[in-house]
């Protein structure tokens, strides 16, 4: 399973190829949480009894589409819409369950890596940042997938463990993916940012 395999590669590098005398940087990008969602065998059937509540904005009513562009309603019966998703008879609720099942392996991956950091006394000397590269829609506004400017499509999780920073703390200020590289350099003590970087370090918000 690709999520497990990528995690294995990461741990193999940490164990066998990392120079323990130098700082290290790892970028691990999981793929199985991209459509079509294919969970690991151990997670198949997970959440089968879980209730999936569809969003109120899915409703095909005049009130729901009041003030919205015509293309939003028109896309209901399209590749991006809940009435003909991916030009198929896809069950959007089951699709969401499949997504959650695939995501469970990412939870396992993060657990294995953080356990390695703890076992090697690096937990409090290593920053860990978990984020997505896009949102996803499961019926919101009558749509599926991504590729539009609704918040469900644009917003992504951003969770960070940074030694010395506040714990269990939520930042309300706007942050964007262009801020991640400057933040990593700041954590590493590199204050001079390359001129092509358009973002700002988020580290001051966590202190």
Model-assigned labels for residue ranges:
Residues 1-5, 11-22, 27-177, 187-196:
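Active-site-proximal cap/lid insertion segments
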Residues 180:
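Catalytic core of tubulin tyrosine ligase-like
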Residues 196-207:
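Short, intrinsically disordered, charge-balanced linker/junction segments flanking boundaries
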């Amino acid at each position: 399973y690709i999520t497990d395999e990528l995690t294995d590669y990461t741990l193999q590098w940490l164990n066998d190829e990392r120079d323990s005398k130098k700082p290290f940087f790892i970028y691990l990008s999981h793929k199985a949480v991209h459509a079509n969602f294919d969970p690991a065998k151990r997670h198949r059937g997970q959440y089968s009894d879980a209730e999936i509540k569809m969003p109120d904005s899915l409703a095909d009513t005049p009130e729901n589409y009041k003030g919205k562009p015509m293309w939003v309603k028109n896309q209901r019966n399209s590749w991006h819409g809940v009435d003909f998703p991916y030009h198929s008879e896809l069950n959007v609720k089951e699709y969401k369950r499949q997504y959650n099942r695939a995501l469970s392996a990412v939870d396992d991956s993060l657990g294995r890596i953080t356990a390695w950091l703890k076992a090697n006394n690096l937990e409090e000397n290593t920053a860990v940042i978990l984020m997505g590269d896009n949102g996803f829609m499961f019926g919101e506004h009558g749509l599926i997938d991504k590729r539009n400017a609704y918040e469900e499509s644009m917003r992504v999780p951003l969770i960070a463990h940074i030694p010395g920073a506040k714990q269990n703390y939520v930042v309300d200020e706007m942050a964007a993916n262009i801020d991640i590289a400057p933040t990593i350099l700041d954590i590493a003590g590199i204050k001079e940012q390359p001129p092509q970087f358009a973002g700002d370090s988020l580290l001051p918000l966590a202190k």
